[in-house]
Design a protein with these regions (language model features):
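Secretory targeting signatures
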Residues: 1-23, 238-271
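Cyclophilin-like peptidyl-prolyl cis-trans isomerases
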Residues: 16-245
Length: 271
């Protein structure tokens, strides 16, 4: 019986083992936090209007080239005023072409053929990291057939899209797409944007299947007002431990103390 009591105390006071979390679930010191401020002004058959902020953490620790490129463009106000030119519900929302800017009235998609083909002047090399995958809300770099052709265009996943991951592509020479961040706040805005009516899905988030091919251009503008750097993830604050917040070492010492006390009491009772 005394052994059972001692084992119970060991289980009670010894900290359990916690599995390592995915790097995309945790924040890391020095990673930039960016904010996409967007607005959707609807029209007839366009669904509900919305506006707000999508907050993302960019993984500088895992994708330094890609993140540095994106942050440099943000600091130049490169993305301000651009609209999301390609939207596929339950897949991605895509933006980042400086030619996709409405001058006055939002352009009629059929006369807007060049939008979606442009980008910034410099390409960056393909950068993949096994820790970064296309989970819901992942942000990645759009590119052409050449893996090293990404410039400024990006997409945000509406739901997990692991078919885009490095190693999951069907073509032998296709390395996939480079993820470099994830949505921390505002995933509901990603979902709302993904559900707007487009040239290939006039009903938006409706029952009609999406027509293949075409630009998947929103019928009404999903406008990026600005993308800004809010902050960089600070170093974790080290607090003094107290009774309600003991460290693993403190718990182990406490457990040992209780066990020794129990043994001493047991010997005294038997003497």
């Amino acid at each position: 019986m005394r052994v059972a009591i001692l084992l119970s105390m060991i289980l009670l006071f010894t900290p359990g083992t916690v599995a390592d979390a995915s790097p995309m679930e945790n924040s890391y010191e020095g990673n930039p936090i960016v904010v996409i401020n967007l607005t959707y002004e609807s029209g007839i058959g366009g669904g509900d209007e919305f506006q707000g902020e999508i907050v993302l953490e960019l993984f500088l620790n895992w994708a330094p080239i890609t993140v540095t490129n994106f942050v440099d463009l943000v600091n130049q106000s490169f993305y301000d005023g651009i609209y999301f030119h390609r939207i596929i519900d339950d897949f991605v929302i895509q933006s980042g072409d400086p030619d996709c800017k409405a001058s006055g009235v939002y352009p009629v998609p059929i006369s807007d053929a060049s939008c979606g083909e442009g980008g910034s002047s410099e390409t960056i090399p393909f950068e993949a990291n096994a820790n970064l995958t296309h989970i819901n809300g992942a942000i990645g770099m759009a590119r052409g057939l050449d893996p090293d052709s990404a410039t400024s265009q990006f997409y945000i996943c509406d739901g997990p899209q692991h078919g885009l991951d490095n190693g999951n592509r069907t073509q032998e020479d296709d390395p996939g797409y480079a993820v470099f961040g994830v949505v921390r706040e505002g995933i509901e805005l990603v979902q709302a944007a993904a559900a707007v009516p487009t040239t290939n899905d006039p009903d938006g988030d409706g029952s009609s299947p999406r027509a293949p091919g075409g630009p998947d251009r929103p019928l009404y503008e999903v406008h990026i007002n600005s993308i800004t750097i809010r902050e960089y993830v600070p170093a974790p604050v080290v607090e003094n431990t107290d009774v309600e917040g003991l460290s693993g070492l403190s718990l182990s010492v406490s457990a040992l103390s209780i066990i020794l006390t129990a043994i001493a009491l047991s010997r005294k009772m038997n003497s």
